Amino acid sequence: MKVLNGMFLCVLTLVVGCGTSDVSAPVASSQPSPEGAQFVATTEPANAVPVGTARESAQDEQEVTLVGRIGGSTEPFVNGLAAFTIVDPKVPHCSADEGCPTPWDYCCTQDQVKGNIATVKVVDGAGKPITGDARQLLGVKELSTVVIQGKATRDDQGNLTVAATTVFVRPGE
């Protein structure tokens, strides 16, 4: 009987320990939501500059078009807002064969990220930030390559934020 109880306890522990959690991060769909479609361009905007170049040259309140890859940290998306960080495509992210569970955090090249990262917040026509999850709203995910159009703002440390009115998601990237 003790053996049977012990086996039952082991099986119960296994079943409970391997259960799925009800709490999960929103995931991207391959398409933007109906609410997000108004912010997503169907053709790629011309003359996009990489994030690193934009950080060097963009002036405060200047209209910009830049290209980057979503990432830069383990959590590049801002909870509750359609906002995220992008990194210059020239900065390599960790590859699958390096065994990195979160290659979008650029843990292998963090020294290169600082001068090649920008924050993107999707805004409406009045410049008000859009609430919701960017993954669902825009159909993006970590390491998606995006082309952003919007207005640049700079802080005292030289950080670049873009109030984006248009987002183009490069297919297959």
Labelled PLM ranges:
Residues C18-E173:
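OB-fold and OB-like single-stranded nucleic-acid-recognition modules
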Residues M1-G17:
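Sec-dependent bacterial lipoprotein signal peptides
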